[in-house]
Regions:
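Substrate-binding surface in catalytic domains of secreted glycosidases
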Residues: 57-70, 154-268
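Extracellular low-complexity, Gly/Ser/Thr-rich intrinsically disordered linkers
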Residues: 291-344
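Active-site groove signature of glycoside hydrolases
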Residues: 126-156, 202
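Bacterial N-terminal signal peptides
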Residues: 9-18
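Glycan-binding loop/region signatures in secreted carbohydrate-active enzymes
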Residues: 99-113, 239-314
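Short, acidic/polar
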Residues: 29-42, 120-135, 180-187, 307-317
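Glycan-recognition patch characteristic of GH18 chitinases/ENGases
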Residues: 22-124
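Catalytic domains of carbohydrate-active enzymes, especially glycoside hydrolases
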Residues: 34-58, 130-142, 317-325
Length: 345
């Protein structure tokens, strides 16, 4: 992909600019609730996924104080002011162990899933806990975002999801399951009942070198892995991007990346293979988000990120490949122009 950077042509740029806006769902993260709710008021999103409920030491899901506060007031106010007055609201549950003790929290803990799926009794107890969480707010449904699942637990988790979807359907609610972009999870069959959404990102990130979160080849590979499913999965796209620096990889929102480019006096280039934007800038240039962290030396950084044209291009290709609804990870840090393109406003 690096060798294709200089191959952008005027025709490709015209094509990117002509990509239509698409209607989408979106996540609002509890650690960036004010910004997420503010963007909710700007976009015409179909469904909102409140991220997230975490797990305590007893493998019980719970809501943080910030999430509870949002559900008590901030969310309702934002929904009332959004262009779409009736978006559905889902609660997303993630297998993160979140405790107050330093160094004790674990993200995407497969052990939690193993213990919850181990026996019929443990699955029944977990189902009861999830249903109890849904009672704190008139949610449209529930989302299960369990990642790094041990492959031996995968069949039991799918069975659990199918049974839970039946229970929720009887209550007039829906279940959605998030699937990682890994062949071991996507190559098998999926039970009818739940909705499914595939994470179409993490092609590049803090685990490897510079590049876009997704590209056309990556999306086509995911479509091939999902082609045998009787259900049409949704497609989750990720906004923002990363900066590769001498001190590691730094997560960036679109706003931060664009401000960095502007401060450095650099015009980002659109990569034809991924439709993402990229540029290079010093870590201490004006607009750099690294200045606030200190320790900058003037070293060169490579930045890749998605804007509205990127997201709309991915969404258009995804739908042409057979994917269903698009979901945006996440609200907070996006420009109004990008929100308009991805929310269908």
């Amino acid at each position: 992909m690096m060798s294709l950077r200089s191959a952008i042509s005027a025709g490709l740029l015209v094509l990117c600019c002509s990509v239509p806006a698409v209607a989408a769902d979106a996540w609002v993260a509890e650690w960036d609730m004010p910004n997420g709710l503010a963007e909710l008021r700007q976009g015409n999103f179909k469904n909102i996924f409140m991220f997230a409920a975490y797990f305590d030491r007893q493998d019980r899901p719970y809501l943080t104080e910030d999430m509870q506060k949002a559900l008590r007031g901030g969310l309702a106010a934002s929904l009332a002011q959004s262009p779409n007055k009736g978006p559905g609201v889902y609660l997303s549950v993630v297998n993160d162990l979140l405790v107050e003790a330093p160094g004790k929290s674990i993200q995407k803990d497969p052990g939690i899933v193993s213990r919850l799926m181990a026996t019929e009794a443990s699955r029944a107890a977990h189902r009861k806990d999830l249903l109890a969480l849904l009672s704190v707010y008139p949610f449209t449904g529930l989302e299960i975002d369990y990642e790094r699942v041990n492959i031996d637990d995968w069949p039991r988790l799918l069975q659990f999801a199918q049974e839970l979807s039946v229970t929720l359907a009887a209550q007039g609610k829906k279940l959605r399951v998030v699937l990682e972009p890994k062949q071991k999870y996507l190559q098998g069959s999926l039970p009818a009942g739940p909705q499914y959404v595939v994470m179409a990102y993490n092609l590049h990130g803090n685990h490897n070198g510079p590049g876009a979160k997704a590209d056309d080849a990556f999306l086509r590979k995911l479509a091939q892995w999902c082609a045998h499913w009787p259900v049409k999965p949704g497609l989750a796209l990720s906004a923002g991007g990363y900066a590769w620096t001498a001190r590691g990889v730094v997560d960036l929102t679109e706003r931060k990346a664009a401000a960095w480019a502007q401060g450095a006096g650099v015009q980002p280039i659109r990569d034809p293979a991924s439709h993402a934007l990229y540029f290079k800038a010093a870590d201490n240039s004006p607009g750099s988000p690294l200045l606030a962290k200190g320790g900058t030396t003037g070293g060169s950084c490579e930045i890749w990120y998605a804007d509205g044209e990127t997201l709309a291009s991915w969404a258009e290709l995804g739908r042409s490949l057979g994917f269903g609804d698009v979901s945006l990870w996440r609200l907070g840090g996006n420009t109004p122009e990008s929100l308009a393109k991805i929310s269908g406003k």
